[in-house]
């Protein structure tokens, strides 16, 4: 162990561990599920792709925790893939030049009115007629980044870049990060629509960001759904679920993933209490109250979130396996 590494380790042990937000936790969980299901050859190939990332040293190697740095190669590789899944969120805070180059805010979510095929609208309408649907383009390869406007298209575009041997090594590395991240995002219900009302939210509540709760807002509450669950125990349950699942039973249609998240939002996320309060506040012209959200709601939210992230990890595994097996 080098002197620098020894000092870093000592300092790390003296500092409190930072709490992981649900975003980082969920993206690492789904990436770890995929990692542990892939073969050693596939894992090595992913790391070879990732090493060509334009910001590999500063955003990956320099960010690796000391306890991971001194561990075995498999643990380091798994952490790197998890960091790749988190990386698109890191791009939000880059210096201006790199933020413009890498940050794509519109890729993380989708307008609730955007539909393709038999998809369900993602919006919950309270006291107002539904907005007209936007009929999205048919499934197919997207050749240009300018054609990508939402999470569905982001998944399809980045899978294509990663799969295309003509893509530059740097482009493939960045696309790997985005694919890992967006497959997680589309499984979060509040990334797929919003609550729309006539007075408070005529253009939508931005996926729950306009609904105050004792944890911040509804979106951040869902973002924090797994924050207090033991990470390793949660990962073991997800890995066990994947082992008990036949790959042929997993629906790999991105439109289906979108539909699943929207069904959760329609049926559970926005409670009758929230909808009634929106109508009452609009009638009285008052602001919304802060919603407590009872233990039953929070428990169900945690169970749903774990199931959605588990599905994301399984689907990432199958998608990466297919891409890596492509000649």
Where are these regions (language model features)?
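Bacterial N-terminal signal peptides that target proteins for export
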Residues: 1-7
């Amino acid at each position: 162990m080098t002197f620098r590494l020894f000092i870093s380790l000592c300092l790390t042990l003296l500092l409190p561990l930072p709490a992981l937000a649900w975003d980082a936790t969920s993206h690492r969980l789904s990436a770890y599920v995929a990692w542990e299901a892939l073969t050693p050859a596939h894992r090595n190939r992913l790391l070879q792709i990732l090493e060509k990332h334009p910001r590999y040293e500063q955003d990956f190697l320099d960010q690796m925790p000391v306890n991971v740095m001194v561990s075995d190669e498999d643990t380091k590789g798994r952490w790197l893939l998890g960091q790749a899944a988190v990386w698109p969120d890191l791009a939000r805070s880059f210096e201006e030049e790199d933020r413009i180059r890498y940050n794509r805010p519109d890729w993380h979510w989708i307008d609730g009115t955007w539909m393709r095929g038999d998809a369900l609208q993602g919006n919950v309408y309270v006291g107002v007629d539904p907005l007209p649907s936007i009929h999205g383009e048919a499934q197919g390869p997207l050749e240009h980044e300018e054609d990508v406007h939402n999470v569905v298209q982001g998944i399809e575009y980045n899978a294509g870049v990663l799969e295309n041997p003509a893509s530059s090594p740097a482009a493939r590395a960045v696309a790997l990060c985005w694919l890992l991240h967006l497959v997680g995002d589309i499984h979060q219900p509040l990334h797929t629509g919003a609550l729309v009302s006539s007075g408070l939210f005529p253009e939508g509540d931005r996926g729950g960001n306009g609904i105050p709760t004792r944890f911040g807002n509804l979106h951040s509450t869902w973002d924090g759904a797994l924050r207090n669950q033991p990470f390793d125990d949660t990962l073991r349950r997800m890995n066990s679920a994947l082992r008990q699942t036949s790959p042929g039973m997993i629906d790999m249609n991105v439109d289906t993933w979108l539909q699943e998240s929207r069904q959760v939002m329609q049926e559970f996320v926005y409670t009758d209490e929230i909808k009634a309060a929106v109508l009452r506040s609009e009638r009285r012209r008052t602001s919304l109250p802060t919603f407590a959200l009872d233990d039953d709601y929070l428990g169900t939210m945690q169970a749903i979130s774990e199931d959605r992230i588990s599905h994301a990890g399984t689907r990432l595994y199958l998608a990466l396996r297919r891409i890596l097996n492509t000649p």
